[in-house]
Amino acid sequence: TFANAVYVYRYQQEQTHWCWAASAQMIGHTLGRQVTQTDIVTQVKGMDINDGANDTEMKNAVTYATLRNSVLRSSAWPFASATNELSTGEPFLIKLTWYKNGEPNGAHAVVASGYNTASGTLTVVDPWYGCGTKTFDYKSMITNCKFQSGTGKWTATIYV
């Protein structure tokens, strides 16, 4: 298959720092589990708080949202691995790191939902306000890419 898309219902993040909870919610919904962002945050953080998440907390969020063991890879996936995962019908979380003057300056979570091997692109669902689903060049995603919600690169992957 040269292209594949997994239907991922887009949930907008309900708080300014809940991109990770919204992304976990999208993955859970796609895999058949309905859970709220508040439930995810409370499960992971121990309270309902508008706070970002570290990599382990994002992994725990995906595990809770899907009721399946999730795996954290502290880097981008090779394109072939990303397409293999999506071809099984399973979206995955991408951690984007924003940079300013060459230094990390924040991060954001989005969900990969499709690919096209002919064009070398991945489709990404962004939970940030006013964003949606858009296709990006894989090579730019792992180096320096202008995403809908900021400019940075793919630095971690969480999948089930």
Regions of interest found by a model, annotated:
Residues 2-49:
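Active-site nucleophile-adjacent alpha helix/oxyanion-hole segment immediately C-terminal to the catalytic cysteine
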Residues 28, 39-160:
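Conserved active-site-adjacent core of cysteine acyl-enzyme catalytic domains
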